[in-house]
Amino acid sequence: MSAIRTYNVEAGLPVLDEARRLVIAEIKEAKRTGAKVLKVIHGYGSSGKGGALCVGLRKSFGLRKKEGVIKDFIAGESFSIFNPTVLAMLEAVPQLRGDPDLNATNEGVSILWLK
């Protein structure tokens, strides 16, 4: 069991609704296996302002947080030691300190803190 699980939803080139379903299933699987963090690779899109997956999935993550499915989520560009939520995540899941996207401002990922 690893505390951190990575899921590349972008790889299959799904439409947004399919990507939402895939990520929800992956959240359930990550929780079942005891992961504390799910790193979702959704890409940023080529428009320069965030593609459908990036924007749509992040809205979905906000809803999952409100529903209590996840504790919180961090957009990749905010995944920094200067973010108080990230500091709390690092304290709870110290393995995250070695993640290559920490402090990298990667807009193509989101970090989900699982309950």
Where are these regions (language model features)?
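Long, charged, low-complexity intrinsically disordered regions
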Residues: M1-K115
